[in-house]
Amino acid sequence: MPYLRHALAGAPFRRSDGQVVVLMSVFMTVLLGACGLVLDVGSWYRADRATQATADAAALAGAQSLIDGTAPAEALAGEYADKNGGGDLTVSFGQRVLENDLITVTVARTEPAFFTKLFGIETVQVNSRATARAGVPSRARYVAPITVNEQHPMLQCECFNDPTQVALINLHNPGGGDAAGAFGLLNLQSLSNPSGNIGADLLGQWIRDGYQDALPLGLYDSAPSANFNSDYIRNALRDRIGEELLFPVYRTITGSGSGAEYDIIGWVGFVPTSFTTGSSTGTIRGYFTKVVWQGLADETGTVPDFGVRVITLVE
């Protein structure tokens, strides 16, 4: 009987040990599954971020070609998508201000599952979308202080890349009192910091480097005190031969001399190829060009379009 009592007394503990083993097995299975899910979800999250980066790059690249049409924009978007990991690409176009000024790129990739295959999940579809806009700038950075009249023949026909010239001349009309002493150069800081006449050294710096702040459209003072044959201006122009510059486009001039004001209505890209300068005249030869520039895009649809675009990611 003592032996029987000892045997009966030990039986519950043997059953408890078995339950613990079963519970531990279930717990370990759940734990491994949870760890596997965490690892797979982390992998899918990284894939989603990579896919979003691809969509962003493709949309921004495509937007740079929107000014040339939707076909070049779609082709460039596809090219950049392939360079950044590829995927199934869908491209569409829309309008915010100008026709087809928006490009939307959707990138889809199939990502494999690893641990979650135990639960029947073989693959996961990762989709990312980005929209970029190519807008006409209402504000522009890195502007050069050389003006172009909106009636320039090459701006009337949008003859980009055709040889032409910008004349830097005394814009005074005899008997008209129209900006006597104004030679087509602007005091770009006159809106924020009026300071009267400025020197050729500062004008040369703006030609070489562009004005650093984002300039709005509006009335700008003339800069009549600098000679075109100054070494500052000549050296700056020489440094920019063959490079894109951004010129302000004006509609009207009022006043005279240092009091003359140019009504700046837009911006245009120009590539100088050569120049001549004198004390009171000058000519910059080159061609107008479509450019992508830094600035803020117009939201009103009222800024004239001279072939300059500001690219922004809007979604």
Model-predicted segments: where are they?
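N-terminal leader/signal peptides at the extreme start of proteins
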Residues: 1-17, 22
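Alpha-helical hydrophobic helix detector
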Residues: 22-39, 53
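N-linked glycosylation sequons
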Residues: 71-74, 94-102, 122-315
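Flexible, membrane-facing loop/turn or short amphipathic-helix motifs
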Residues: 114-122
